[in-house]
């Protein structure tokens, strides 16, 4: 197959940052995706509808001329989020979900939830108005092995949460384990998951090949090969409970290559080419459009896009670095040659 035509996809988990960084990275996302669920972990985080509206406006102002893009906003859940804020979020029309970060779990999550059980009144309100909950599904207990934190979160917090709020729509984001796949498969239609390109392409060996490879470091961290294989099977199965979410997370090279490097992989530049590489290797290119273009909007109860994009068999090399404010930005798998190339349909 030399060419694939797909309905224009959406990214259901994206970090855009703010200010000059936003202006630097947004064009990459806008080129490939029609919409994106935008993460709220700025400094300070996006905690209210008013803050989400202001951030929404800043994103719209940064869209390159001649491009169309719809940012789908989220609120950052804290111990102090109120049911009234949830009602306002639902009524806003542009806030599409609420994001749960365990305090300290990942970049800019210090103000996250200290105990998920403190948020039951908020979850009740979300269930009532049908506003989805997006989960960074890891525990932060330092006694739990970093490779086990997703599994422990599912057993300790997610199963009880689902039992307490059976009608709450939940997205377990950037899943990394066979345990997460099995939980989603065993749950009803109100539970779904996003999967990143890095967790489909690589296992934890990639972080340590010939030394420390900081540009493969993300959270949740890459896992062993058996987990990657389970994710691959889920993503390419055609099951609508699994859909595209890049978790593209830009950090300047100096923030990645340091004695305390930041977690995150930048894939917005070449996300669809990476996913196509994965699906082709699995002999499942016929399943790519559902994963990338259909299952996400269906879960979020939004219309599917009508525009088309193409991927053609055109070899090209991922750049070693991209421009970024006061630094440079190293894309995921920098220097690698890919055989698929993205193009919009004229």
UniProtKB/Swiss-Prot annotation:
Sites where the protein binds Zn(2+) 1: 13, 15, 99, 247
Key words, A-Z: Hydrolase, Metal-binding, Pyrimidine biosynthesis, Zinc
Positions annotated as active site in the UniProt record: 247
Annotated catalysed reactions: (S)-dihydroorotate + H2O = N-carbamoyl-L-aspartate + H(+)
Superkingdom as given in the UniProt entry: Bacteria
Any single GO BP term: 'de novo' UMP biosynthetic process
Modified residues (N6-carboxylysine): 99
Transmembrane portions of the chain: none
CDD domains in the cross-refs: DHOase
InterPro entries: Amidohydro-rel, DHOdimr, Dihydroorotase_CS, Metal_Hydrolase
Listed cofactors: Zn(2+)
Enzyme class: hydrolase
Pfam families, alphabetized: Amidohydro_1
Subunit structure: Homodimer.
Stated family: Belongs to the metallo-dependent hydrolases superfamily. DHOase family. Class II DHOase subfamily.
The protein's name: Dihydroorotase
Organism: Picosynechococcus sp. (strain ATCC 27264 / PCC 7002 / PR-6) (Agmenellum quadruplicatum)
Taxonomic lineage from the root: Bacteria, Bacillati, Cyanobacteriota, Cyanophyceae, Oscillatoriophycideae
């Amino acid at each position: 197959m030399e060419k694939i035509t797909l309905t224009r996809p959406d990214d259901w988990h994206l970090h855009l940052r703010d200010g000059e960084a936003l202006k630097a990275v947004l064009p990459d996302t806008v080129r490939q995706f029609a919409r994106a669920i935008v993460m709220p972990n700025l400094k300070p985080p996006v905690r209210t509808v008013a803050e989400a509206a202001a951030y929404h406006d800043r994103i719209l102002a940064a869209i390159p001329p001649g491009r169309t893009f719809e940012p789908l906003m989220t609120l950052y859940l804290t111990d102090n989020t109120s049911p009234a804020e949830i009602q306002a979020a639902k009524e806003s029309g542009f806030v599409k979900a609420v994001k749960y970060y365990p305090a300290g779990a990942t970049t800019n999550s210090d103000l996250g939830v200290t105990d998920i059980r403190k948020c039951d009144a908020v979850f009740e309100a979300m269930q009532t108005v049908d506003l989805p909950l997006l989960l960074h599904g890891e525990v932060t207990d330092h006694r739990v092995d970093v490779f086990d934190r997703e599994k422990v979160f599912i057993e300790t917090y997610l199963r009880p949460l689902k039992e307490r709020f059976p009608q709450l729509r939940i997205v377990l984001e950037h899943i990394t384990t066979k345990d997460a796949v099995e939980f989603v498969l065993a749950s009803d239609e109100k539970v779904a998951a996003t999967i990143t390109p890095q967790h489909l392409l690589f296992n934890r060996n990639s972080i340590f090949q010939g030394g420390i490879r900081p540009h493969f470091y993300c959270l949740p961290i890459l896992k062993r090969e058996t987990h990657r294989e389970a994710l691959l099977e889920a993503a390419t199965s055609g099951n609508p409970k699994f859909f595209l979410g890049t978790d593209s997370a830009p950090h300047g090279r100096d923030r990645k290559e340091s004695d305390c490097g930041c977690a995150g992989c930048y894939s917005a530049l070449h996300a669809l080419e990476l996913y196509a590489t994965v699906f082709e290797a699995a002999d499942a290119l016929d399943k790519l459009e559902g994963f990338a273009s259909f299952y996400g909007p269906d879960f979020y109860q939004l219309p599917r896009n009508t525009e088309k994009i193409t991927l053609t068999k055109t070899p090209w090399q991922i750049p070693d670095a991209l421009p970024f404010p006061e630094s440079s930005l190293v894309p995921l798998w920098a220097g690698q040659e890919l055989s698929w190339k993205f193009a919009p349909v004229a």
